[in-house]
Amino acid sequence: MLLTINLKDSFLTFFSNLGFSNEFSKALWIPLPILLLIILAVVGVLVVVWLERKISAAVQQRIGPEYAGPLGVLQPLADGLKLAFKEDIIPSKGDVLLFTLGPAIVVIPIFLSYLIVPFGENLIVSNINLGIFFWITVSSVAPLGLLMSGYGSNNKYSFLGGLRATAQSLSYEIPLALCVLSICLLSDSLSTIDIVQKQSTYGILGWNIWRQPIGFIAFIIAALAECERLPFDLPEAEEELVAGYQTEYTGMKFGLFYIGSYVNLLVSALFASVLYLGGWSLPIPIEFLLNKMSLNASDSEVQVISAFLGIGMTLLKTYLFLFLSILTRWTMPRVRIDQLLDLGWKFLLPISLGNLLLTASLKIALL
C-alpha cells in the first residue's frame, strides 16, 4: 500500500505542536471532515454549473457567462447569492410541513453519499464495509422528497412532477443497483476502497470498464435517469409541467433543488470513476513508475505526491463523465414518459440482470 498517511493523527499532531491540548484538538477534528465535505461539495457544484454553462454555450456557438469574474467563473456564486435574498413564498392552500421538508429531504441524503467516496486509500471520510449499499440506500430516499414537494405545493403540475420523479426513480434504481452488484461480485467486496484496489494492480488494463462494458453503459444510462438529466428530465419538463415539482418554490428552497440535482450528478460521476475507471489509480501502476524512477515508496514526499496524483486522477475521470453528460443534454431530445418507463423496465432491467447472472456464473466457474 503506497498511501499510509493517517489524516486524523497528522491533524492531532499538528495542533499539539501548536500548543493546544489533545482534548481540544479531538473536539476540533470531529466536525471538520463533515464541514470540509460540505464545502468541497458546494465548490464542486459551482464548478459543474460553470462548466455546463460554458460547454452548452460552446455547443450552441454562444459566449456564455462572461462578466462575473474571469471567464464568468463567479456567475454560479452570483446566482446563488441572488436566490438567497429572494422572498420565500409558501402556497396559501399547500401543506406547509411537506412543502418545507421536501427540499431538505432531497439534498441531505445526496450529501451523505460523499461520506464513502474515496479519493485515496485513506482519503475517505468513512470507510464502511457496506459502502456501496449505503450509497444505494440513501440515494433512494431523495425521490420521497420530490413527491412530498409536489404534493405539498397543492399544484397539479407540481404533483404530476413529483409522481413522475417517483416513477422514474423506481424504474432506474433497480438496474443501477444490479450494475453495482456486478462490480461488487468482481471485487469480492462492498467497500469502495477495496473496489478501487482490485482495479489498481494492472493499471488501465485492470479497470472494470473492460470487464463490464455492458454494465458500464447501463450504469451511465441509469445514473443520468436518476439525476433527471436530459433526455430523462420528465419530472420538470418545461413544455408540459411548467417546472414540475419546483413550480411553486422560490428563493433558497428553489435553489436547493438545483444544488441537489448537480450534487447528485457529481456523486454519480464520482461513483462511475470509482466503480469502472479505477478511482484514484493511474493508467500505469504507481509501483512500476516508482521502480523506473528509483524512488522509495515509504518516503513521505512520495506519499504526499501520490496522494495528490490520486485526487487529480479521480477528479479527471469524474469531469470526463460530466463532460459526456453535458454533451448528451444537447445532442438528444427528451423522451416521452412511456418511452422512459419502457427503457427502464423492458430493456435496462433485463440487460443489467443478465449482466449480473453472467458475472456470477463466471465467478462460480473460476472457483
Swiss-Prot record:
Reactions this protein catalyses: a plastoquinone + NADH + (n+1) H(+)(in) = a plastoquinol + NAD(+) + n H(+)(out); a plastoquinone + NADPH + (n+1) H(+)(in) = a plastoquinol + NADP(+) + n H(+)(out)
Keywords for this protein: Chloroplast, Membrane, NAD, NADP, Plastid, Plastoquinone, Quinone, Thylakoid, Translocase, Transmembrane, Transmembrane helix
Main location group: plastid
Gene Ontology CC entries for this record: chloroplast thylakoid membrane
EC numbers, comma separated: 7.1.1.-
Enzyme class per UniProt: translocase
Any Pfam family the entry gives: NADHdh
InterPro entries, alphabetized: NADH_UbQ_OxRdtase_su1/FPO, NADH_UbQ_OxRdtase_su1_CS
GO biological process: aerobic respiration; photosynthesis, light reaction
Bilayer topology term: Multi-pass membrane protein
Record localization: Plastid, Chloroplast thylakoid membrane
Residues making up the signal peptide according to the UniProt record: none
Transmembrane segments: 29-49, 96-116, 128-148, 176-196, 204-224, 266-286, 304-324, 347-367
Any one GO molecular-function label of the UniProt entry: NADH dehydrogenase activity
HAMAP family for the chain: NDH1_NuoH
Family listed: Belongs to the complex I subunit 1 family.
Subunit architecture: NDH is composed of at least 16 different subunits, 5 of which are encoded in the nucleus.
Role played: NDH shuttles electrons from NAD(P)H:plastoquinone, via FMN and iron-sulfur (Fe-S) centers, to quinones in the photosynthetic chain and possibly in a chloroplast respiratory chain. The immediate electron acceptor for the enzyme in this species is believed to be plastoquinone. Couples the redox reaction to proton translocation, and thus conserves the redox energy in a proton gradient.
PANTHER family, per the entry: NADH DEHYDROGENASE SUBUNIT 1, NADH-UBIQUINONE OXIDOREDUCTASE CHAIN 1
Name of the protein: NAD(P)H-quinone oxidoreductase subunit 1, chloroplastic
Native species: Mesostigma viride
